[in-house]
């Protein structure tokens, strides 16, 4: 049985934490930023923990 390949696009966008959760980054922070408040843009810079239902699908793309 061949080894499962890692989805390279997902590997660049998501990381696994030490506890096994999936860490990602917020959307809506690349353009059209003039109408967004400074507080909102500041919070979008931070990473976030992906929701469990999405993390299940992402973890299939990142087997190793």
Swiss-Prot record:
Annotated S-S bridges: none
Gene3D superfamilies for this protein: 4.10.410.60
InterPro entries: Ribosomal_bL35, Ribosomal_bL35-like, Ribosomal_bL35_CS, Ribosomal_bL35_sf
Keywords per UniProt: Ribonucleoprotein, Ribosomal protein
One Pfam family per UniProt: Ribosomal_L35p
GO cellular component: cytosolic large ribosomal subunit
Keyword Ribosomal protein among UniProt keywords: yes
GO annotation (BP), single: translation
Any one Gene Ontology molecular-function term assigned to this protein's record: structural constituent of ribosome
Record carries keyword Cell inner membrane: no
HAMAP family: Ribosomal_bL35
PANTHER family the record matches: 54S RIBOSOMAL PROTEIN BL35M (PTHR33343), LARGE RIBOSOMAL SUBUNIT PROTEIN BL35M (PTHR33343:SF1)
Family, as annotated: Belongs to the bacterial ribosomal protein bL35 family.
Name of the protein described by the UniProt record: Large ribosomal subunit protein bL35
Species whose genome carries this gene: Desulforamulus reducens (strain ATCC BAA-1160 / DSM 100696 / MI-1)
């Amino acid at each position: 049985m061949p080894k499962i390949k890692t989805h390279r696009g997902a590997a660049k966008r998501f990381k696994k934490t030490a506890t096994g959760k999936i860490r990602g980054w917020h959307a809506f922070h690349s353009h059209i930023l003039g109408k967004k408040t400074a507080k909102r843009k500041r919070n979008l810079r931070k990473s976030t923990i992906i929701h469990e239902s999405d993390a299940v699908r992402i973890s299939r793309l990142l087997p190793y």
